[in-house]
UniProtKB/Swiss-Prot annotation:
<dbReference type="InterPro" id="IPR036188">
    <property type="entry name" value="FAD/NAD-bd_sf"/>
</dbReference>
<dbReference type="GO" id="GO:0005886">
    <property type="term" value="C:plasma membrane"/>
</dbReference>
<dbReference type="InterPro" id="IPR021163">
    <property type="entry name" value="Ferredox_Rdtase_adrenod"/>
</dbReference>
<keyword id="KW-0521">NADP</keyword>
<keyword id="KW-0813">Transport</keyword>
<feature type="binding site">
    <location>
        <position position="53"/>
    </location>
    <ligand>
        <name>FAD</name>
    </ligand>
</feature>
<feature type="binding site">
    <location>
        <begin position="213"/>
        <end position="214"/>
    </location>
    <ligand>
        <name>NADP(+)</name>
    </ligand>
</feature>
<comment type="function">
    <text>Associates in vitro with the adrenodoxin-like protein MFDX1 to form an efficient low potential electron transfer chain that is able to reduce cytochrome C. Functions as accessory mitochondrial protein involved with BIO2 in the plant biotin synthase reaction.</text>
</comment>
<dbReference type="InterPro" id="IPR023753">
    <property type="entry name" value="FAD/NAD-binding_dom"/>
</dbReference>
<keyword id="KW-0093">Biotin biosynthesis</keyword>
<comment type="similarity">
    <text>Belongs to the ferredoxin--NADP reductase type 1 family.</text>
</comment>
<dbReference type="GO" id="GO:0009102">
    <property type="term" value="P:biotin biosynthetic process"/>
</dbReference>
<keyword id="KW-0249">Electron transport</keyword>
<feature type="binding site">
    <location>
        <position position="32"/>
    </location>
    <ligand>
        <name>FAD</name>
    </ligand>
</feature>
<feature type="binding site">
    <location>
        <position position="391"/>
    </location>
    <ligand>
        <name>FAD</name>
    </ligand>
</feature>
<dbReference type="GO" id="GO:0022900">
    <property type="term" value="P:electron transport chain"/>
</dbReference>
<keyword id="KW-0560">Oxidoreductase</keyword>
């Protein structure tokens, strides 16, 4: 039997017209979850897909992670909304895996469970002083200015001094630097949370330091994001000329990567332009600080328990293997004073009970999206009916579109397993889930509830001349959904 015919026969077996629909549950309503749902619905005409999320709002980091001054990136929401409105798809928000229901209960209810809940925690540096107040992860800061209900009450210290330090030089670091330095008049017409805009208007921050362990050639950012921050009005760029010196190893890296060469050229051009112009005392400054790594955080003498700076160790690059250079500490140290530190060193996924998890890599062990319970030699034992997609599958890397290919691979594995006849028993699916949630008095938010939230936010936005005014507390979100 051909592969096409086998897939057709399986699709007919799990037909919506029969008593054996294929019940699929996707945990997480970000890009990975919606792309997976879309591909499952297209591949299997008998599939019924439920997308659950702990938040009452769908779309994951497209809503809470994308910077407010990047509205074009949020266009993906239109496609995801069409998926959620599909007759064989349901969004069920305000349902938390691990507390409202367990993974084992989901697996009992559905033929297929796909975990796509991303990375909602942060990597730690593991250095002294990391618990001082005034130190935040970039994720916390991003969720604060994007109106995430978990962080709407955050009070980042923007007024104690004129300096903030960002550890990391990737695109997330550039995002938070841009929000700190961009004129608030330009942010006012975006969907930035009002509490964040008000705080930024009163901010004393005038100098932002972007700290990287390696050099400008190795900076983990993209030219598009860099050009945007370099183009901020009345922003003075500062880069030490010595940091722009390149070695033969750097030259080799740029030969093999046009992107790295372009980044270096943009930084060099910005540094040269800054040398020929005098800094206005009222200008804001963005300092790119290379070849430094944090050794410890310094505590304020005046404000006990609060950060007052970062002790940095100078680094040099050493070649390891072909074309790769790593940062090595030199034993020389210097202090950099600040009142706020943002750690943009990476997101981290968290496990749930009953889920195999690689704590070192921060991912669920998997083979092409199939969750692996244990491995012996070259043989991997997989968990029947349990799959993973997105950051939980591959780590917190890539852009929104990366999840499209990731979902394609996972759904390919699901289809192969269906063809092999892995599931032949009936499952309760949506009906069983709704009964369980009702029994536990969980206030679920369906897509119609989200549409009420969406309509209210847009209406409030019209009144304030912005795309939307986000509801930023759990109470307000749930009240709007139930209205």
């Amino acid at each position: 039997m051909s592969r096409y015919l086998a897939r057709y026969m399986v699709s007919r077996y799990f037909s919506s017209a029969s008593s054996r629909p294929l019940h699929v549950c996707i945990v997480g309503s970000g890009p990975a979850g919606f792309y997976t749902a879309d591909k499952v619905l297209k591949a299997h005409e008998g599939a019924h897909v439920d997308i659950i999320d702990r938040l009452p709002t769908p779309f994951g980091l497209v809503r809470s992670g994308v910077a407010p001054d990047h509205p074009e990136t949020k266009i993906a929401i239109n496609q995801f909304s069409r998926v959620a409105q599909h007759e064989r798809c349901s969004f069920i928000g305000n349902v938390k895996l691990g507390s409202d229901l367990s993974l084992s209960e989901l697996r009992d209810l559905y033929h297929v469970v796909v975990l796509a809940y991303g990375a909602e925690s942060d990597k730690d540096l593991g250095i002294p002083g990391e618990s001082l107040s005034g130190i935040y992860s970039a994720r916390e800061f991003v969720w604060w200015y994007n109106g995430h209900p978990d962080y709407s009450s955050l009070k980042p210290d923007l007024k104690t001094s004129d300096s903030a330090v960002i550890l990391g030089q990737g695109n997330v670091a550039l995002d938070v630097a841009r929000i700190l330095l961009r004129p608030t008049t330009e942010l006012a017409s975006t969907d930035i949370a009002t509490h964040a805009l008000s705080a930024l208007k009163e901010s004393s921050i005038r100098k932002v330091y972007l700290i990287g362990r390696r050099g400008p050639v190795q900076a983990a950012l993209t030219a598009k994001e860099l050009r945007e921050v370099l183009g901020i009005k009345n922003l003075h760029i500062r880069i030490k000329q010595t940091d722009l010196s390149v070695t033969p190893a750097d030259e080799e890296e740029m030969k093999t990567s046009r992107a790295r060469k372009r980044i270096y050229e943009l930084l060099s051009k910005a540094a040269a332009a800054a040398k020929t112009s005098e800094a206005d005392p009222d200008q804001r400054e963005l300092h790119f600080v290379f070849f430094r790594q944090p050794d410890q955080f310094l505590e304020s003498d005046e404000r006990k328990g609060h950060v007052s700076g970062v002790n940095l160790q100078k680094t040099i690059l050493e070649s390891v293997g072909t074309g790769k250079q790593i940062a090595v500490g030199t034993g020389e140290f210097e202090d950099l004073n600040c009142s706020m530190v943002l750690k943009a060193i990476g997101y981290k996924s968290v496990p749930v009970n009953g889920l195999p998890f690689d704590h070192k890599k921060g991912v669920v062990p998997n083979v092409k999206g199939r969750v692996v319970s244990h491995t012996s030699g070259d043989i991997s034992q997989t968990e029947p009916g349990l799959y993973v997609c997105g950051w939980l599958k591959r780590g917190p890397v890539g852009i929104i579109a990366t999840n499209l290919y990731c979902a394609e691979e996972t759904v390919g594995s699901i289809s192969e397993d269906i063809e092999e006849g892995v599931w032949k028993s009936s499952k309760a699916g949506s009906k069983g889930l709704m009964q369980l949630l009702e029994k536990r008095k969980v206030k679920k938010v369906e897509f119609s509830g989200w549409e009420k939230i969406d309509a209210k936010e847009k209406q409030m936005g019209i009144e304030r001349n912005k795309p939307r005014e986000k509801l930023v507390t759990w109470e307000d979100l749930l009240a709007a959904a139930a209205n």
